[in-house]
Amino acid sequence: MFLRTQGFKKLLKEAVAGGGLLVGNDGAGTCLCGNYWVMWIKDGCIPKKELAAIIELAGEVPEPGEAFRVYKEENQYEIMEGPVYNVMKNAEECTEVFDITRIVIRNGKGKPLRILQDRFRRIILIDERFIDMIDNTVLDMGSAEKPAKEARAGRLPWVFWYNNIMALHVMPIATEKNKNLISYLEETRIEKMEKEHAASEETKEET
């Protein structure tokens, strides 16, 4: 997996404490879903630490065709329906590449948001935590897992990262506070990070 273990665990715990963590099995892999993100990992490809984190919170991994939402108190069985759960298919259909720029701004609540920009200079914002989590250096080099591709977008209003065993969807964040700044930045080409899938230790800018 191209996600750092610590960030992965924190993401799951926050989902359980919030609107619930959906854990599903579509027969080919495991789907995990929070309030603003979805990921899918191919069967047999979840590392031991990450699998242990899922079982610790959910109590079990669902059987093929099953899904349930994990809350603090209990698990509730659900049905995975809708295009959002076709995680890998959606990722593979994306055609537009977004550069991860060097600029980080903050929304009205102080949350750091990373600016991503495509070839048309269009800008989207995502939670900075995902830039910190995505790291190709944590891949299992003894396996056939490939590095994650660049951030991409397609017909769904999400940002996607994926490789040959997993896919991650992240919902962009809208912020009225920085609306004028975004319009201004879309008039120029922003410098991108040198290492897109390493921790974000670059110089950050706030507004």
Predicted region positions:
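C-terminal functional regions that serve as terminal interaction/effector modules
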Residues: 34-37, 42-43, 52-207
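Flexible glycine-rich active-site/ligand-binding loops centered on an Asp-His dyad
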Residues: 46
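Intrinsically disordered, low-complexity linker/loop segments enriched in Gly/Pro
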Residues: 1-41
